[in-house]
Structure formats: C-alpha cells, structure tokens
Amino acid sequence: MIRVGIIGATGYTGLELVRLLKNHPEAKITYLSSRTYAGKKLEEVFPSTLENSILSEFDPEKVSKNCDVLFTALPAGASYDLVRELKGVKIIDLGADFRFDDPGVYREWYGKELSGYENIKRVYGLPELHREEIKNAQVVGNPGCYPTSVILALAPALKRNLVDPETILVDAKSGVSGAGRKEKVDYLFSEVNESLRPYNVAKHRHVPEMEQELEKISGKKVNVVFTPHLVPMTRGILSTIYVKTDKSLEEIHEAYLEFYRNEPFVHVLPMGIYPSTKWCYGSNHVFIGMQMEERTNTLILMSAIDNLVKGASGQAVQNMNIMFGLDETKGLEFTPIYP
C-alpha cells in the first residue's frame, strides 16, 4: 500500500486528490496538511469528503516518516522550499515550481529565484509524452490545466511534422474552479454568471510551459498566441487551436488515431464530431476533435478536459501510478459524470 500525503488538502485540487485517493485500491492517505484549517477534521470543514483525518500544519519530519509520496497542491512559489526539506519521499507538485527545464524561464514569468534547481531530478509529468522518465522520477512537475489540453491536442501533428509550428493560435475557455479556491471579486457569482470574458491576454503564465513542451516534440521553434477565457461553469476546459497545414484532414486524423491508439485516457473523435466539456466531467479523460478550414489551409483542433482531474489531480494520480509501477489507470477507471 502506498502511503500518501497531501499538502494544501483544502483547496480544489487538494480536495480532488482526497476524492480520488480514497477510492484508490493501492493507496492510503496518511498525512493531510492545511494551514488554514489545521487542527480540524477534514470532514468538519468539507463534510462531503467523509474523511475524519485531522489536518495539520506542514511538518517535514512527519511527512518523511509517514509518506512514500507527497502531493503538493499549493500555489506557484509555495512548494519549492518545502520540498527541499524532505528526504526519501517522492514528490508530485501540482503547482508550477518543477515544470520548467530552465529556472530562468520560471524566474521571468513567476518572479522567484529557485536556488539549487539544477540539482533536482525532476520530470515534466505529462504521461502520454514522458512516461518512461516518470517511472524513475523523484520529483514530478504536474502540468498546468491549459497546457495539458493544448499539448495533447497538438502533439501528434507536431511530432509527425504535419503543421507549421511558427504561429499557433489558442482560444481556451475554463470553468471558474481553475482559478482556485480564493476570495476575489472577479469570481463572485454576480460577476461570473451569464458572462464570458478573456483574461491575462498575451501574458498568461502557461504560455512558456506550452512552448517548452511543444518545442521538444517538434524540434523547432514554436510560438503560441494564447487567449484564455473565464466561463460561468464550475469545471472544464475547451481549447480551440488554429494552425496552418498543407496536409489533408484524413491524413492528420489517421496520424492522431495511431499516435493515441494505446492511450487509455485520450480519445480521438471521429471526423465531424466535436468535444464537449460535459463528456469528461469529473474524469481523467481527454476528447480531441478536428476540422479543416479549406479556404485558408487551417487545421482547427479542439480538446476538452476536466481542469481539476486530467488538468490537475487525476493526472497527478496517474503519475503516482507510473512512479510506483502500477497500472496507470488504477483509481481512475471511472467514467465521466453525465449529464
């Protein structure tokens, strides 16, 4: 049985980890931490968890003694120093602190210096692309939600050199839970309900993460123009991607079917069928559709994920499974909730 700890257990991704891991046949939650609710039982704060473990302040000695793996479900910049205090524990960080190959990129976009970063054996935790490296990883940087939807949608096309990577346009829409569990006027019901708006246009911090991984796939310079939008729903991301090509839709579709043929969570839809966020609600599944705009030779790719599952906690559990030599679908086999 894998002994599991969660730091940040009362945020949305932390709570999703609790939900998934309580139903995992090979995992046992042995440590839960929350600075805000330390000293309380989790079910006192969130009765829906049915979890009577007592939340505590972060204690590296207790984590090292009681956990085989630790999930850090904290905002960017909060995990790095905590993780460096631990010994003999595998780490899966759901923030951005371990996602970048170059710490200078993190410093530029997140405003923090990561001292000693070059000494950490870390892997970018997108299983469909880095499965072999994840198997032996000590620290996994779990991908961001938007990058997961965009990278998986583009990977086959870039790998097979089917599209022009020079300029990739991404229009993405996310439910409000993607912003995390925090008090901010922008996320009040009256502000979000019956409204659709863009945010962080041309400056979202997920852009360098997308470009890093897409360039590794293509072997070429990639430029992503990314506009995210907030939509009045709780969960889900739908990314629509526009990229130039001189290939036929049939050839591209066949390449996608082949690329993802053995992937348990990635589903390439038949031509003419387009994905919906409702299809992956509460699950680790990804749905990818495509269409060709013949007049301009533009391939239009569409991908749908649940931002809290495949975009965060589900993918983290998938990474844990790989790190401990389990079938990566363990604890994640359930179908989406519909309607």
Curated annotation (Swiss-Prot):
GO CC annotation terms, alphabetical: cytoplasm
Enzyme Commission (EC) number: 1.2.1.38
Compartment(s) where it occurs, according to its Swiss-Prot or TrEMBL record: Cytoplasm
Cited InterPro entries: AGPR_AS, AGPR_type-1, NAD(P)-bd_dom_sf, NAGSA_dehydrogenase, Semialdehyde_DH_NAD-bd
Record carries keyword Plastid: no
EC category name: oxidoreductase
Reaction(s) catalysed (UniProt annotation): N-acetyl-L-glutamate 5-semialdehyde + phosphate + NADP(+) = N-acetyl-L-glutamyl 5-phosphate + NADPH + H(+)
GO biological process, one term: L-arginine biosynthetic process
Coiled coil: none
Keyword Cytoplasm: yes
Active-site positions on this chain: C145
Domain of life the protein comes from: Bacteria
Function: Catalyzes the NADPH-dependent reduction of N-acetyl-5-glutamyl phosphate to yield N-acetyl-L-glutamate 5-semialdehyde.
Similarity annotation: Belongs to the NAGSA dehydrogenase family. Type 1 subfamily.
Protein known as: N-acetyl-gamma-glutamyl-phosphate reductase
Organism name: Thermotoga petrophila (strain ATCC BAA-488 / DSM 13995 / JCM 10881 / RKU-1)
Lineage: Bacteria, Thermotogati, Thermotogota, Thermotogae, Thermotogales
Gene that specifies this protein: argC
